[in-house]
């Protein structure tokens, strides 16, 4: 459980410098920037969610195959097939309205001679004669029309899929009969009181709407989809269909979860955003015919409005990004009218509106997730501006319009001039509208966009309305304020401490004995076996979870340790080094993608960037086809554990800080992987270099791309602990047998230990290089 929570935190929780994101958006003018905030992301490193708003409608999409459900008793709704999926139960279903219909389905296994069997139907013990001389299963449909009558065999379904069906429709009960794969359905028994028919189902079952009856017939005759036959499909109680979902209202506070100190509150709010543009008009010196620049400026606005009877005081700051620079030059003379630069916002521009109000939702906006908004669009039209020349008719700028469309919302630390509080930063994309703008008495006409001359026209403000929603982690005691840690001094002290810890951690590389390292790497490791020697594993997990929420950014090593946890979790209870020591994680799909990428074109494999990408992902394939050899993850984990054990300063509290910014490739950055076919080895490293050579002579041979693709798809991928260069050097200087070469190629830890015990300098040097690469 702890490792699951930790893995989720590593995967989802990181923080983002908002200012960097905004600068990037502005410089690249990108319209598709989406950052997953993760749970409890901090406001002072605000998460960014820029995505389309999904507006719920009343359309309900019914699943074709709903289930499986656990055995139960209930009144099935009319016009829904009950698809019965028994295992070896003798009584599959009982149904009655207690007036004129009693129906039961009995299951009889293949190859049963004529015999009398005892069944309990509707609380009564009955002797019923059954027979099944086929190799398929048989469903016997038994029926009676009164409580005093005896059950009669009505009809039979002979099935190799072992599936049966039951339906209430119109005024009849419907079932299947015949023999698969040609079984059919029609009504079995009529009743005047169909709605009161209650069923007791003794097997797992599915629910299929009658509108999808063709699929039900298909399942009866050919079987369930393969997905339904895996161990991952677990039946649930039918009551799960009756869960009542609380639909969030427009203005309300909902407690999502609560502990002794903290609670998650969902705030749903109506919102009215009023904003206006500001501009700066700078005139050049001289005779008064020339203007230097006319540009947009940030504009603050404060206003009040009613929200469900509550008076709300709101503040907004409007700014623009991605402006377009225009100019006009009427001539070279000092008396010729000209504007050196004037700004226009168009389709490639963005408008940002920071919003804050004094409601409860903004008082604890520190740890926030699930921030969404739904806003309408607004049209902004430009007005007239007169260029007052000393002599002559004045040029007049007029027209121009754009529409603002909601494109995303983030938490913002860019506060308004009125208050220094957390705010919401709404982002709007633009489309140009009619009329175009022009400058009267000049050549400028028919241009689209909103110029900075008079962007508000006659409007005091522009208004956008609708709603927003967020979930905030707040203290359980409403009198407490959520603490905000944004001290520069604290961050500098922390960086200094982390620097000292990294230096100590890296200096310990010289103290690791290689035989000890290999012995340790042979052990089955899971997430917390790396922290043996720490007094409390639980405390370590808690500390790491807390630190990760605060410190982990885009940590590659966080992902690496998460992968290590998944790939080694099954090994914690076994000392075997068999192929089962690695859980078959979701790497296969990742590698399949790589295989398709490589197979697509032989030329693309020869491209250096493609080679690098492929070789880095080779380790995913390696995990799913683990051999008896040692791999890079074993060494990484062993080095990490050894250094922690030797350290005098590293504790569970500081470990997440140390590795917060490290990446998995940096821990052992110079990796190499190989595949083996007969007497030929094909090797790839993360720098994009590929080798092919013979095992006996270490003579290089041409690298066959197609063969390599086939091998990495179908054969085990091995960590090249002793790489090709080291092997060739070892063979040239010492000479090694074919058997030793194969063992070294397979990274056999026993042979590695033998070479180290013999103080072989070439092998020792290679292992030392790997240890020294494990730096932070």
From Swiss-Prot:
InterPro entries: ConA-like_dom_sf, Rota_A_VP4, Rota_VP4_MID, Rota_VP4_MID_sf, VP4_concanavalin-like, VP4_helical. A motif (YGL motif) lies at residues 448-450. The record marks 231-232, 241-242, 247-248 as: Cleavage. Residues 484-516 form a coiled coil. Residues 510-776 are annotated as: Spike foot. One of its GO terms (cellular component) is membrane. One of its GO terms (biological process) is virion attachment to host cell. The keyword Membrane applies. HAMAP family: Rota_A_VP4 (MF_04132), Rota_VP4 (MF_04125). Residues 389-409 are annotated as: Hydrophobic. This strain probably does not use sialic acid to attach to the host cell. Transmembrane segments: none annotated. Residues 248-479 are annotated as: Spike body and stalk (antigen domain). The keyword Coiled coil applies. A motif (DGE motif) lies at residues 308-310. This is Outer capsid protein VP4. A motif (KID motif) lies at residues 643-645.
């Amino acid at each position: 459980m702890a490792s699951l929570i930790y893995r989720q935190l590593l995967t989802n929780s990181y923080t983002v410098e908002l200012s960097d994101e905004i600068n990037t958006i502005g410089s690249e003018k990108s319209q598709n920037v989406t950052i997953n905030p993760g749970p409890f992301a901090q406001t002072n490193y605000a998460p960014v969610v820029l995505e389309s708003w999904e507006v719920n409608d009343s359309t309900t999409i019914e699943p074709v195959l709903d289930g499986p459900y656990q055995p139960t008793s209930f009144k099935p709704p009319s016009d829904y097939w009950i698809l019965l999926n028994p295992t070896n139960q003798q009584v599959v279903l009982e149904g009655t309205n207690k007036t004129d219909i009693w129906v039961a389905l009995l299951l009889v296994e293949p190859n049963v001679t004529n015999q009398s069997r005892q069944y309990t139907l509707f609380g009564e013990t009955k002797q019923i004669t059954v027979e099944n001389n086929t190799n398929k299963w048989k469903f016997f449909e038994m029926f009676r029309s009164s409580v005093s009558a005896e059950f009669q065999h009505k009809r039979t379904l002979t099935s190799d899929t072992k599936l049966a069906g039951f339906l209430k429709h119109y005024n009849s009960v419907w079932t299947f009969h015949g023999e698969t794969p040609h079984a059919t359905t029609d009504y079995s028994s009529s009743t005047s009181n169909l709605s009161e028919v209650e069923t007791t189902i003794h097997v797992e079952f599915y629910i299929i709407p009658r509108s999808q009856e063709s699929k039900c017939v298909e399942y009866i005759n050919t079987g369930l989809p393969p997905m339904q036959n895996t161990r991952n499909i677990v039946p649930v109680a039918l009551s799960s269909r009756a869960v009542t979902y609380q639909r969030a209202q427009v203005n309300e506070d909902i407690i999502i979860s609560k502990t002794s100190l903290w609670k998650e509150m969902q705030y749903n709010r109506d919102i009215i955003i009023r904003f206006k543009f500001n501009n700066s008009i700078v005139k050049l010196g001289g005779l008064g015919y020339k203007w230097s620049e006319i540009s947009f400026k940030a504009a603050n606005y404060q206003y009040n409005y009613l929200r469900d009877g509550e008076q709300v005081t709101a503040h907004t700051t409007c700014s623009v990004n991605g402006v377009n620079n225009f100019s006009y030059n009427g001539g070279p003379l000092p008396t010729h009218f000209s504007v050196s630069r004037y700004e226009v916002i168009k389709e490639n521009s963005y408008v940002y509106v920071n919003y804050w109000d004094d409601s409860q939702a903004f008082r604890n906006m520190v740890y926030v997730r699930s921030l969404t908004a739904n806003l309408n669009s607004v049209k902004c039209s430009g007005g007239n501006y007169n260029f007052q020349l000393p002599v002559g008719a004045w040029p007049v700028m007029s027209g121009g319009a754009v529409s603002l469309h909601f494109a995303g919302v983030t938490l913002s630390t860019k506060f308004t001039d009125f208050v220094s509080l957390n705010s919401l930063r709404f982002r709007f994309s633009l489309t140009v509208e009619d009329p175009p703008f022009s400058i009267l008495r000049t050549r400028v006409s028919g241009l689209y966009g909103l110029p900075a001359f008079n962007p508000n026209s006659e409007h005091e403000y522009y208004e956008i309305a609708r709603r927003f929603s967020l979930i905030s982690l707040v203290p359980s005691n409403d009198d407490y304020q959520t603490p905000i840690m944004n001290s520069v001094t604290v961050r500098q002290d922390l960086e200094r401490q982390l620097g000292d810890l990294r230096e100590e951690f890296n200096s310990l590389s010289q103290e690791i004995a290689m035989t000890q390292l290999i012995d340790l790497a042979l052990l089955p490791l899971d997430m917390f076996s790396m922290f043996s020697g720490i007094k409390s594993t639980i405390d370590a997990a808690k500390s790491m979870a807390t630190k990760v929420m605060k410190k982990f950014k885009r940590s590659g090593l966080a992902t690496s340790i998460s992968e290590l946890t998944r790939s080694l979790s099954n090994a914690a209870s076994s000392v075997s080094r068999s192929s089962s020591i690695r859980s078959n994680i979701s790497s296969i799909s990742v590698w399949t993608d790589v295989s398709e990428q490589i197979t697509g074109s032989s030329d693309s494999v020869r491209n250096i960037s493609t080679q690098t990408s492929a070789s880095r992902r080779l380790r995913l394939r390696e995990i799913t086809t683990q051999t008896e050899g040692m791999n890079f993850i074993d060494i990484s984990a062993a080095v990490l554990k050894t250094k922690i054990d030797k350290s005098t300063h590293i504790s569970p509290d500081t470990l997440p800080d140390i590795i917060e910014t490290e990446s998995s490739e940096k821990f052992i950055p110079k990796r190499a992987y190989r595949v083996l076919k007969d007497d030929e080895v094909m090797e790839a490293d993360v720098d994009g270099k590929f080798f092919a050579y013979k095992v006996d002579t270490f003579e290089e041979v041409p690298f066959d791309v197609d063969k390599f693709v086939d091998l990495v798809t179908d054969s085990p991928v091995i960590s090249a602990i002793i790489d090709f260069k080291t092997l060739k050097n070892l063979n040239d200087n010492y000479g090694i047998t074919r058997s030793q070469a194969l063992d070294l190629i397979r990274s056999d830890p026993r042979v590695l230990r033998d070479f180290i015990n013999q103080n072989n300098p070439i092998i020792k040097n290679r292992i030392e290089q790997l240890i020294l690469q494990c730096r932070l």
